[in-house]
Amino acid sequence: MPATLKNSSATLKLNTGASIPVLGFGTWRSVDNNGYHSVIAALKAGYRHIDAAAIYLNEEEVGRAIKDSGVPREEIFITTKLWGTEQRDPEAALNKSLKRLGLDYVDLYLMHWPVPLKTDRVTDGNVLCIPTLEDGTVDIDTKEWNFIKTWELMQELPKTGKTKAVGVSNFSINNIKELLESPNNKVVPATNQIEIHPLLPQDELIAFCKEKGIVVEAYSPFGSANAPLLKEQAIIDMAKKHGVEPAQLIISWSIQRGYVVLAKSVNPERIVSNFKIFTLPEDDFKTISNLSKVHGTKRVVDMKWGSFPIFQ
């Protein structure tokens, strides 16, 4: 019997007291007209959570789409992110993001990676890049700056009214512990946005974040750009069993695990389809949860940050 699909409407409560929709629309690699039209389509389909970032180089398109959608600003939860080259002055970076977005404030501002990047070798003035040394390795600031100093500045931003909450992204358990235990820490991150999917379930990190009152957000739920999870035979077979799309199955499984999931597409039909979810029976839920034990874990977004212990 086909599953009963319904539009996603659930929210989770942040440690600030604000609510965040559990199904968000991701905008990574959605540039130019694709970025604009996909956000328009998402808002039309019912999404009320848009996830952006300075490094995605599409904040202007995202902001224009939000304005043109006709959906009142206060009904949309909007996130953007601080890039590593701007960690020394997050307020200035946020001001630039707000200008590009055409907004007075965002609902959530994240430190995109816990890695401060040097700008010494940036010659064209464009700091929204990944600076590299002559040998091709990333030019990381390992001596004069660190994510603790960045967070000390970020935690003051909600007082300005330019963001309602601050959080982190791609933080490991050890990095979160270091942040929370730092002497000048006053604010627990509202969220930690990380890669999660059936082949990288992140059970330990999710449990740790929940214990600390940090809402987890999952990016790349289908395994990033080429969506390899949608080609997993076990996923395909189970989706057929329930009369749903593989993407709907994965999104529903993710939400059932109790965290925010960010779905991304530039295809209008898939954008609508991805917004419809259902409740998996317990045995099928466990089958998907155990896929990584059968096939092994696989991290898709495996950024190389030199010797920085990013996922340790």
From Swiss-Prot:
Localisation per UniProt entry: Cytoplasm
Predominant location: cytoplasm
One GO location term (cellular component): nucleus
Binding site for substrate: 112
Positions annotated as active site in the UniProt record: 56 (proton donor)
UniProt induction comment: Is expressed during aerobic growth on glucose, and its levels are rapidly up-regulated by osmotic and oxidative stress.
Record-linked InterPro entries: AKR, AKR3A, Aldo/ket_reductase_CS, NADP_OxRdtase_dom, NADP_OxRdtase_dom_sf
Miscellaneous comment text of the record: Present with 14100 molecules/cell in log phase SD medium.
Name this protein carries in UniProt: Aldehyde reductase YPR1
Organism of origin: Saccharomyces cerevisiae (strain ATCC 204508 / S288c)
